[in-house]
C-alpha cells in the first residue's frame, strides 16, 4: 500500500506543485519543510496518520507527537505566526516633537500680557525723560544768554543744550515706537491669539464628542455580534475594521488640534519678533547718530576739550589724582625739578619729548586722559618752551613742534621717560662738561692772579 501511494503521487501530472510525501524507513510519512504550507498545518496530522498496516492507538499518538515536534523544529514553522494585517497609516500624537497643552497656551497669554505692561511703562518713562531733557536743554540755553557769560562759554553751553535737545527728541521717538509697535499692535495680537485659541478648543471639543459617540455605537455593535451563537467571520472582521477606523479618526483629530495649537503659538511669536526687531533697529540707529556728535567735526569738539574723562581708571578724584587734590599730582614733577636744578637740558632728557600730532582733525582727548595735570607742570612746560624759542629752533624743529606741550595743547600725550642707560650716559656727559667748566674757571683765575702780580 505505501508503494501504490508513492507511485500514484509520482505518476500524477501536477506532482511538482502538490505536497510531497516520502516514506521514512517504513514507519510514517514525512512532510518536506520546503513545501510546508502554514494555513494547512491542522491537516498534516490527519494525512501523516495514514498507515498501511494495522497499529495500536498508542503508536498513532506517538507518531502524531513526533510529527508536531518535527514541524516546530523546522524554520518554516517559526514563521507561521504573522502579525496582524490591519495597520494604521494615520498620524498620531507620538509623531509630534512638541505638544502645546492648555497650560502652555495660558503661559503664552501671560507672557504677552507682561510684555504689554512693561512696554507701556517703558514708553511712559521715556516720554517723561524726554520732557526732563528738554527742560535741561532750555535751562542751559538761558544760562548762555546771560550778560556775564562770554562768547566762548556761551557757544559751548549752546552746544551742550543742542545735545540735550537731540537726546530728548530721540527719546520721544522711541517712546512713540514702543507705544505703537509694542502697545496697540501687541494688544491686537493678544486678542487674536485668545480668539483663535477659543475657536480651536470649541471645534475640537465638538468633533471629539461626535467621534466618541460613534466609537461607543461601534463598540456596542461589536458586542452584539460577539453574543451570537453562529459567528460570521466576514462580518466580524468588518466590524473590527470599522472600530479601528473610528479610533484612527479620533487620534487624527487630537493630532491636528495639537498641531494647530503649535502653529498658532509659533505665528504669534514671529509677529512679536518682527515688532521687537523694528524697535531694536530704531534704537541702534538713534544711538549711532548720537555717537557721531562726539566724532571729529561733529560739533562738540571744543566742548569736549574742556571735559574730564569720567571713565578713567587711573584716577579717582575730580582733578585727575587719587585723592582729588591737584597739589599731589605735581610732586613727581617738582622732585624732578629739584634734582635737576635749573638745567633745562637735563629736565628735557629725563622727561623726554612727545611725538607731534600730524592730524588736526582727530578727536581731541579730554583733560582727564593724561596721567597728571597740575599748574606746576604747565609752568615748567612754559619755561621749557621759552628756552626753545630763545634757542632759535635748534635740531630742525619749528615753532609748531615746540609748542606741542603748551597751554593750547593741554590734551596732548604725557611725556615719556628715557631708559636707565640713556640717563646714566647723560649724567656722564654732564659730569665731564662740568669738570671742563671747572678746569677752565681755575685757569682763568690763575691768569687773573698772574696779571695782578
From Swiss-Prot:
Biased composition (Basic and acidic residues): 431-442
Location(s) in or outside the cell: Vacuole membrane
GO biological process: vacuole fusion, non-autophagic
Keyword terms: Coiled coil, Membrane, Phosphoprotein, Vacuole
Biased composition (Low complexity): 353-371
Molecular function terms from GO: identical protein binding; phospholipid binding
A single GO cellular-component term on record: membrane raft
Broad class of where this protein is predominantly found: membrane
Cited function: May be required for vacuolar fusion. Overexpression leads to fragmentation of vacuoles, missorting of the vacuolar enzyme carboxypeptidase Y (CPY) to the exterior of the cell and accumulation of multivesicular bodies inside the cell.
Other facts noted in the record for this chain: Present with 2840 molecules/cell in log phase SD medium.
Record's protein name: Protein IVY1
Protein species of origin: Saccharomyces cerevisiae (strain ATCC 204508 / S288c)
Organism ancestry: Eukaryota, Fungi, Dikarya, Ascomycota, Saccharomycotina
